[in-house]
Curated annotation (Swiss-Prot):
Post-translational modification Phosphothreonine, affected residues: T199
Protein known as: Phostensin
Biased composition (Pro residues): 424-446, 567-578
Compositional bias segments (type: Polar residues): 301-310
Organism listed in the record: Macaca mulatta
Modified-residue entries (Phosphoserine), positions: S54, S125, S133, S175, S195, S224, S368, S432, S490, S530
Length: 613
C-alpha cells in the first residue's frame, strides 16, 4: 500500500485544525451566549436566522456584509415605530459592529498564530478613535512634544483658533508628576495671542500669576483665548482707571473685593494699584506697551457697537463683546487710543458745573474712567460714602443705551447721571411734587431723554418714575382734589358727566352696560387666563332667578317691591375726592340710584366687574 503523499497529510492536518478551531469558536460562542441576558441572546439568534447562518457560526465580517446586496429592511428605518431602546435599529447596528469585532478577535485567538495579540491591540480603543478626530490628534501631538508643536503653531497663522479647552482637559488628565510642566503649557494660548517676537519668559510669568487662583483658571477654561484676553485687559484697565493708589485702596474697595479672587494676594493688589497710579504706565504684567496698544486698538474697534452695562459686571463675569459696558468703551476710547487721558473740553467742564450737588458727586463716581488724575482726587473725596451705594445700585439696574461712544462725552454722561439721580430713594412726602433736580441736567434737545420721558410730566398727581428693566412705571397719586381719578365707568358715562360741570348728572340706565365697562369681561375677576385666548369661549351669563335661588341674592325687583323708589338721590358734595376705600361702594350707590328711579327700563341685574387689582 502506497504511503500517503505529503501534500495530502498537510491538507488533512489543516482540515483537522480548522475543525478544531470551529469547535473552539462554537464553544466560546455558547459560553458567551449563556452569559448574555435573554433579550440579547434572542436578538443574536434572530439575526443569525435572518442571515441564514447555523447557530454556532459567527456573523460575517462587516466588510463582507457591506460588499453583498443591501439589507432589505434598510428602508424600514423610516417606518420604525418608537419602541424600547435596545430594539432601536441604529443601536442594534452599533452593537452588531462591536460584536463582530469581538468575534473577529476571538477567531484570531482560536487559530494558534502570532497574530492574535497584535490584532487585539490594534482594535481601536475608544480613546484612539477619539484621537482620530482633529482636536484629539492635536492634543495628542501636544502631549507628545509640547514645545515642538508650540513652535510649529506659532509659525502657522491658525494658532488663534485653538481654544483653551483641549489644553485644560489635557492638564487635568496629567499625572501629578507632570504638574511642573503645566505653567509652560498654560502659557501657550497667551503666547499665541501676543506677537511672535515675544520671549517665552514673559508668558511664563503670566501663566504663573494666573495659576495661583484655581477659580480664575476654571473661568478661563470655559473661554476662548480671545475672550480671556479681553477679560484680563478689562481687569487691568479697571485698575488703571483709579487715579491714585492710596485713594483706590480707600474708595474703590467695592471693586477690589469683587476682583480679589483674581489676584494672588494683598501685596500683589497693592502693587497693581500702585502701578496703575501712573497713567502713562501700562499695568499688564510682563507685556510690552506696544503689544498692549495693539490689543487695545482692536478692543476700541470692537467696543464701538457695544451697549451700557456696569463696570463691575464687566469685571466679575466674562462678558461677551455685545454686552461690553458703555463706560469701559469710553475708557478705552479716551485712554487707550492716545495712551494718556483725554483732555477735558470747556464744554464738559461747563456741563459739570451746571449740575446740582448730589448729581455731581454721583457723576464723579460713575464717570471715574475719564476723569483726569488731578480732578479725580479732589472730587472723589467729596463723593465718599454716598457714591458707593449709588455705584452698587447703578450696577444692578443699568440699562443699555443706544448712544455711540463718540456721543458719550455729552449725552452719555447726562444719561448715566440721570439714572443715578432717579435711582435715589423717592422723597418721603409722596404728595409734594418731586424736586426739579432730575430734569435739570437734561438739555432741551436731548433726543434720548425726551424719548424715554415722553408723556411723563412731573406734576402734582404723578410720582417719580421708577425704572425696572426697560419699562417706566408711573404711579399716579389718587387723593389730590384737582385731578379726578379714572373711575371704571363706561366711556358713555364719562362723556355724559362732562357737559354739566356745575350740576352733577348721573348716568341713566341705558348708559350702564356692565358696571366697570368691561363688555368682553377681559379684565374681569371672573375670567381666568389671558383674555385674548379665552374670550371666544368665555360666555358668562347671569339668570336672575337662578342667582336668587341658588345664591340667595335678592333681585332688585324684589328689593324695589319692598322699599319702593327712593324720593331723592343722596349726592355727596365731592365724590371723587373720597378715600379710595369708599370709592367703589360709593360708585355702586350712585350708579344704582338712577336705575331705581327710572323704573327698571333694562335688566334688573347689574354685574359689578370693577374688582380691585
Amino acid at each position: 500500500m502506497a504511503t500517503i503523499p505529503d501534500w495530502k497529510l498537510q491538507l488533512l492536518a489543516r482540515r483537522r485544525q480548522e475543525e478544531a478551531s470551529v469547535r473552539g469558536r462554537e464553544k466560546a460562542e455558547r459560553e458567551r451566549l449563556s452569559q448574555m441576558p435573554a433579550w440579547k441572546r434572542g436578538l443574536l439568534e434572530r439575526r443569525r436566522a435572518k442571515l441564514g447562518l447555523s447557530p454556532g457560526e459567527p456573523s460575517p465580517v462587516p466588510g463582507t456584509a457591506e460588499a453583498g446586496p443591501p439589507d432589505p429592511d434598510e428602508s424600514s428605518v423610516l417606518l420604525e415605530a418608537i419602541g424600547p431602546v435596545h430594539q432601536n435599529r441604529f443601536i442594534r447596528q452599533e452593537r452588531q459592529q462591536q460584536q463582530q469585532q469581538q468575534q473577529r478577535s476571538e477567531e484570531l485567538l482560536a487559530e494558534r498564530k502570532p497574530v492574535p495579540l497584535e490584532a487585539r491591540e490594534r482594535r481601536p480603543s475608544p480613546g484612539e478613535m477619539r484621537d482620530q478626530s482633529p482636536k484629539g490628534r492635536e492634543s495628542r501631538e501636544e502631549r507628545l512634544s509640547p514645545r515642538e508643536t508650540r513652535e510649529r503653531r506659532l509659525g502657522i497663522g491658525g494658532a488663534q483658533e485653538s481654544s483653551l479647552r483641549p489644553l485644560e482637559a489635557r492638564d487635568w488628565r496629567q499625572s501629578p508628576g507632570e504638574v511642573g510642566d503645566r505653567s509652560s503649557r498654560l502659557s501657550e494660548p497667551w503666547k499665541w495671542r501676543l506677537s511672535p517676537g515675544e520671549t517665552p519668559e514673559r508668558s511664563l510669568r503670566l501663566a504663573e500669576s494666573r495659576e495661583q487662583s484655581p477659580r480664575r483658571k476654571e473661568v478661563e477654561s470655559r473661554l476662548s483665548p480671545g475672550e480671556s484676553a479681553y477679560q484680563k485687559l478689562g481687569l487691568t484697565e479697571a485698575h488703571k482707571w483709579r487715579p491714585d493708589s492710596r485713594e483706590s485702596q480707600e474708595q474703590s474697595l467695592v471693586q477690589l473685593e469683587a476682583t480679589e479672587w483674581r489676584l494672588r494676594s494683598g501685596e500683589e493688589r497693592q502693587g497693581y494699584s500702585e502701578k496703575c497710579g501712573r497713567k502713562e504706565e501700562w499695568p499688564v504684567p510682563g507685556v510690552a506697551p506696544e503689544e498692549t496698544t495693539e490689543l487695545s486698538e482692536t478692543l476700541t474697534r470692537e467696543a464701538q457697537g457695544s451697549s451700557s452695562t456696569g463696570m463691575e459686571a464687566a469685571e466679575q463675569r466674562p462678558v461677551e463683546d455685545g454686552e461690553r459696558g458703555m463706560k469701559p468703551a469710553e475708557g478705552w476710547k479716551w485712554t487707550l487710543n492716545s495712551g494718556k487721558a483725554r483732555e477735558w473740553t470747556p464744554r464738559d467742564i461747563e456741563a459739570q458745573t451746571q449740575k446740582p450737588e448730589p448729581s455731581e458727586s454721583a457723576e464723579k463716581r460713575l464717570e471715574s474712567p475719564s476723569v483726569e488724575a488731578g480732578e479725580g482726587e479732589a472730587e472723589k473725596e467729596e463723593a465718599g460714602a454716598q457714591g458707593r451705594p449709588l455705584r452698587a445700585l447703578q450696577n444692578c439696574c443699568s440699562v443699555p443705551s443706544p448712544l455711540p461712544p463718540e456721543d458719550a462725552g455729552t449725552g452719555g454722561l447726562r444719561q448715566q447721571e440721570e439714572e443715578a439721580v432717579e435711582l435715589q430713594p423717592p422723597p418721603p412726602a409722596p404728595l409734594s411734587p418731586p424736586p426739579p433736580a432730575p430734569t435739570a441736567p437734561q438739555p432741551p434737545g436731548d433726543p434720548l431723554m425726551s424719548r424715554l420721558f415722553y408723556g411723563v410730566k412731573a406734576g402734582p398727581g404723578v410720582g417719580a418714575p421708577r425704572r425696572s428693566g426697560h419699562t417706566f412705571t408711573v404711579n399716579p397719586r389718587r387723593s389730590v382734589p384737582p385731578t379726578t381719578p379714572a373711575t371704571p365707568t363706561s366711556p358713555a358715562t364719562a362723556d355724559a358727566a362732562v357737559p354739566g360741570a356745575g350740576k352733577k348728572r348721573y348716568p341713566t340706565a341705558e348708559e350702564i352696560l356692565v358696571l366697570g365697562g368691561y363688555l368682553r369681561l377681559s379684565r374681569s375677576c371672573l375670567a381666568k387666563g389671558s383674555p385674548e385666548r379665552h374670550h371666544k369661549q368665555l360666555k358668562i351669563s347671569f339668570s336672575e332667578t337662578a342667582l336668587e335661588t341658588t345664591y340667595q341674592y335678592p333681585s332688585e325687583s324684589s328689593v324695589l317691591e319692598e322699599l319702593g323708589p327712593e324720593p331723592e338721590v343722596p349726592s355727596a358734595p365731592n365724590p371723587p375726592a373720597a378715600q379710595p376705600d369708599d370709592e367703589e361702594d360709593e360708585e355702586e350707590l350712585l350708579l344704582l340710584q338712577p336705575e331705581l328711579q327710572g323704573g327698571l327700563r333694562t335688566k334688573a341685574l347689574i354685574v359689578d366687574e370693577s374688582c380691585r387689582r
